[in-house]
């Protein structure tokens, strides 16, 4: 009897979850069925995939986005970086048509996202941090259910091969690992053959090998003309994938360009990092002759220098003179992460 009661309880939970999923799809269908507004009544062909001019959005007294402007070309991977509260999510939600702006001009695929209707929504894909799918459905059932929201769609077989889950097609979502569930989210984002794909932390939960395979998928999509807007906290991911990027902080853009140009803005500096066993009065003898700027926390020191050979010789000579071992000594070129942390702070 207890087992029967549990089975009935599981059945009720399953039906509730399935009901929530169907209601979610009904909302999607309702959005897609909304009339297309604008003079042409359809999404036109444009040379720029996304244009944003002087975009602003406030929540009460909080200015979440303050006069942001940028553009994205077709087939480009465009990354939006920044700490929590920088305005990234609000900006992306406005681009997706899920939030109204207070002022400024926004064009995605030639239309205002809030007025694009079904023609617009059939041309974008969205991979949220959490898709909220019914985990009691199988992968096949989930893809089949969500594909009905799109008028032009890839086959389930094609999509499942793209995300490398062919052997899990008839597995329940609940039985997949976190990384595999994230790949299902990615499959849902591309099943509608989007012209613009929004990726919000797409590789969270992936192991390093799976993350790199997903990068190849993103490159393939972009290479075939899909415009991709990427938000990620993995700076290596942005450096690897982005053609152009912006860094936001406090609702404004604090840096913009290619990953290479942002590194160049930091100069040709080399980063020397190491840890001291202790900090004492003799430290001045280490830092004073250096050509670069020093920063640190606790025992960790970081030297940003344009003369790495001379400074490294001085640092190691000082350490030998004092009989000190420099733990974790490394010499590295400036990375996008270094530039990012200088822009937004190490506590972000």
Where are these predicted regions, by residue range?
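Short linear motifs in low-complexity or flexible loops
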Residues: 2-3, 9, 13, 19-21
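Intrinsically disordered, low-complexity cationic segments
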Residues: 13-15, 31, 232, 290, ...
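ABC-family P-loop ATPase nucleotide-binding domain
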Residues: 15, 21-56, 346-348
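C-terminal coupling/interaction segments
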Residues: 25, 38-40, 308-348
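ABC transporter nucleotide-binding domains
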Residues: 48-50, 57-249, 255
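A generic structural signal for secondary-structure junctions
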Residues: 125, 147, 151, 246, ...
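ABC transporter nucleotide-binding domain
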Residues: 216-306
């Amino acid at each position: 009897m207890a087992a029967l009661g549990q089975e009935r309880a599981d059945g009720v939970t399953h039906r509730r979850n399935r009901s929530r999923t169907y209601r979610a799809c009904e909302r999607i269908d309702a959005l897609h069925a909304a009339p297309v507004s604008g003079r042409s009544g359809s999404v036109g062909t444009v040379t720029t995939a996304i244009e944003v001019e002087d975009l602003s959005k406030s929540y009460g007294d909080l200015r979440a986005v303050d006069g942001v402007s940028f553009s994205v070309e077709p087939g480009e991977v465009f990354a939006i970086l920044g700490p929590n509260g920088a305005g990234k999510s609000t900006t992306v939600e406005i681009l997706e048509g899920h939030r109204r702006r207070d002022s400024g001009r926004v064009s995605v695929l030639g239309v205002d996202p809030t007025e694009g209707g079904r023609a617009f929504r059939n041309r974008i894909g969205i991979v949220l941090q959490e898709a909220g799918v019914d985990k009691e459905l199988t992968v096949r059932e989930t893809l089949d259910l969500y594909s009905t929201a799109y008028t032009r769609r890839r086959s389930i077989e094609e999509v499942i091969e793209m995300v490398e889950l062919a052997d899990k097609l008839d597995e329940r979502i609940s039985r997949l690992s976190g990384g595999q569930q994230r790949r299902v989210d990615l499959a849902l984002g591309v099943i509608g053959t989007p012209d613009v794909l929004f990726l919000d932390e797409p590789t969270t939960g992936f192991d390093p090998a799976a993350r790199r395979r997903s990068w190849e998928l993103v490159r393939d999509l972009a290479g075939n003309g899909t415009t991709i807007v990427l938000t990620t906290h993995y700076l290596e991911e942005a450096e690897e994938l982005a053609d152009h990027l912006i860094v936001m902080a406090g609702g404004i853009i604090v840096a913009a360009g290619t990953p290479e140009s942002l590194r160049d803005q930091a100069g040709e500096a080399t980063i020397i990092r190491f840890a001291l066993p202790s900090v004492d009065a003799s430290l001045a003898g280490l830092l004073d002759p250096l050509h670069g700027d020093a920063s640190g926390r606790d025992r960790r020191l970081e030297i940003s220098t344009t003369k790495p050979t001379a400074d490294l010789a001085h640092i190691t000579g000082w350490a030998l003179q004092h009989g000190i071992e420099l733990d974790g000594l490394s010499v590295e070129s400036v990375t996008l992460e270094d530039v990012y942390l200088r822009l937004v702070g190490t506590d972000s």
